[in-house]
Amino acid sequence: MKQFLNETVLRFITSSFIGTSFWCVFVYLPNAAFSILLFGILCTILLVEWKNLFRLNDFWFWFIMPWYPILPFGIMIYMSSTPCYRTLIYYLFVIVFAFDSTAYVTGKLIGVRKIIPHISPGKTVEGCVGGFMGALVTFYLSIRYQQITMPVALMFALVFIVCAMAFVGDIFESFLKRKAHIKDSGNILPGHGGFLDRFDAVMMASFFFFLFRSELTNLLCVQI
């Protein structure tokens, strides 16, 4: 229990720092600043963390890299630098980070039923349900604050799809780490590991936001 509390506090401090930093850059600095921040994170992943998953001369090192992580980060950089899609990046991070955080805490506290123990033994049904509920509440409060109305069924569906894709992204990175026999992709973020560990879920969910960017913009059209 003491170890869980220490890990949770460390993750909370790191998450708070990341969240606050992202919010300040996103809201108070020019649009290009957030794109530069994302590009810097991508470069760190490629130059520092990616080689921990694959050998440099490995075919998969070069085959997977353009699709993951380069393409999803390219999507996020494009959308964050485009005024009409900028709001979507805000909600992408809100939903995924809320899902990640509450899924972790719920899973550690009451998680029993493992989902894919041979790939990611820490993922449980209870954690995923808790993560979904946490993301749903956070998203609801966010759109209420922005005075956006949305049918309940549509809100449930949107959050569920984003959380499902975030879960797939998390599992995919866990699979890569399992193959590489490592626990974390890096150690730059205390309590989380590397940037790839923190952004794996966001990267996968970004595909959904990009594919349905026009429809989502009509729903979430308030500029942040």
What are these regions (language model features)?
Residues M1-F4, L42, D184-G191:
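Juxtamembrane loop-helix boundary motifs flanking transmembrane segments in multi-pass membrane proteins
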Residues L211-I224:
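Juxtamembrane boundary at the C-terminal end of a transmembrane helix
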